[in-house]
Design a protein with these regions (language model features):
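Acyl-donor (CoA/ACP) binding surface of acyl/acetyltransferases
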Residues: 1-29, 61-182
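Short, N-terminal intrinsically disordered low-complexity segments that are rich in Pro/Gly
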Residues: 14-15, 36-39
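Short, polar/flexible loop-turn hinges at active-site or ligand-entry regions and domain interfaces
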Residues: 34-37, 100-101
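Active-site rim helix/loop that mediates acceptor-substrate recognition in acyltransferases
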Residues: 39-59
Length: 182
């Protein structure tokens, strides 16, 4: 089925885990960066930017792996935390999956991952920020029970144009109401 392999880069404590997935994570990030980043994402050294992103996520960066083939399906990480690491209130989820897994496989994995995060980390709320034109991700979020919370008009610049951003979220309480989750 699937496994969530935590990727850790902790230079301060000299701890590194599952770095063998980083070349594939890097490849996915480059392939789909137009869906992930705005014009303010300035990375002269994209490899260093990935390492910094993994390290900044504070142990909340995962390779999502097909456990039968050990093939990378995608990755997920959290940022913009509210609370502290002993008492997490909310965070923003970011994901990217290889195209061959888009559709029902991503939906299955996403459902498992959201359940895993609520159960194991005690989040009260998980948020997602989506570029307005990313219809596929918005549909996925809605199918998982996320609700649109806000439209931030002209929130950023993408392709030298003002870009609207939508915020979606789901709370632990809402997730508990869904029969087979948590």
């Amino acid at each position: 089925m699937i496994k969530f392999a935590k990727i850790i880069i902790d230079r301060k404590n000299n701890e590194y885990r599952n770095l063998h997935f980083l070349p594939e994570v890097f490849s996915l990030m480059l392939k789909y960066e137009r869906f992930m980043f705005d014009d303010y994402f300035q990375a002269n050294d994209i490899v260093k930017a990935l390492f910094d992103m993994v390290e900044a996520s504070g142990r909340f960066f995962w390779a999502i792996v097909d456990s039968e083939t050990n093939e990378l399906m995608g990755f997920a990480y959290f940022d913009n935390f509210i609370g502290n690491f002993q008492n997490l209130h909310s965070a923003e989820i970011n994901t990217c999956f290889a195209r061959k897994y888009w559709g029902s496989q991503v939906r299955f994995v996403a459902k498992k991952f959201i359940k895993y995060c609520f159960k194991n980390y005690g989040f009260k709320k998980i948020k997602a920020t989506v570029f307005r034109e990313n219809l596929m991700v918005k549909g996925l979020l809605r199918s998982l029970g996320f609700k649109k919370e806000a439209l931030l008009k002209g929130e950023t610049i993408k392709n030298n144009k003002l870009q609207d951003v939508e915020i979606y979220s789901i709370t632990r309480r809402e997730k508990c109401k869904q029969k087979k989750l948590i």
